[in-house]
Amino acid sequence: MNVETITSRQNPLMTHLRKLASSRSYRKKSGEYLCDGTKLLDEALKWGAPVQTAVFSDGVEIPTLPDTVRAVCVSEDLMRSVSPMETPQGALFTVALPETKLPETLAGKHYLVLDSVQDPGNVGTILRTADAFECDGVFLVNACADLFNPKTARATMGAIFRREAYSVTPEELFALLSKSGVPLYGTALREDTVPLSDANLSKAAVAIGSERRGLSQQMLDECAKTLKIPMSPRCESLNAAIAATVVLWEMYR
């Protein structure tokens, strides 16, 4: 396996990696996204993700890579200068963006909708949990964190390489759910709210809102009913990722 050595921070590849880390529009334009860590690289290779380039710190054991992957070695100092993480894990790699196309109809039974969930760690953790509980799909609407942000990808722990997720407009989502006969429920309080454990989730999409604002009015207007997670009156709300975990577990069991 041929491994290049790069020493300059101004090298075009290093500049490319920094842009992938910081710019959603650049990721879309270049057709690649950036991931961090040897464990995540192992997951990418295991699940056949289209890895393009892999960069390793000096001293890190380089795994067997497909012949199509460009392998590069850099100093630890150079790795710190390009890594989007405060504590680099010894490897950065780029993956081709998937050509995700919305299906004509939804064949599954359990879906999760994220409405303005803007923290990358929360979005990544939710996708990881959706994978664990065999959710049939996750939809991101209204300025959610980018699924392909390096921090989001890292938090998925590999689920990004095997679980379907779609960034859609509210109108696209509502039309698809209606066409597929999948009712939309939301985690919010209003006159028709029922406890989550009492809801019929045998076929449903459940929307989770941001911690600051909850569900958007547009989303609430489309919800057939709203659901609440019973909790101590001392607590006003749950972290979005925790709320999603409870919902996903109820749909799974």
Language model features with spans:
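Structured adenosyl-cofactor binding patch, chiefly the S-adenosyl-L-methionine
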Residues: 93, 132-133, 147-160, 217-253
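Active-site/ligand-binding-proximal alpha/beta "capping" segment
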Residues: 185-235, 239
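Short beta->alpha connector loops at strand-helix junctions that form conserved
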Residues: 74-75, 115, 141-142, 164, ...
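RNA substrate-binding interface of SAM-dependent RNA methyltransferases
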Residues: 46, 98-99, 103-190
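Boundary-proximal intrinsically disordered activation/regulatory segments immediately upstream
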Residues: 1-60, 144-145
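Glycine/small-residue-rich loop that forms an oxyanion/phosphate-binding "nest" at active or ligand-binding sites
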Residues: 63, 68-96
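Active-site regions of enzymes building and remodeling cell-envelope glycoconjugates
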Residues: 66-76, 109, 202-205, 224
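Short acidic-hydrophobic, aromatic-tinged amphipathic segments that line or gate anion-handling sites
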Residues: 4-8, 72-75, 163-173
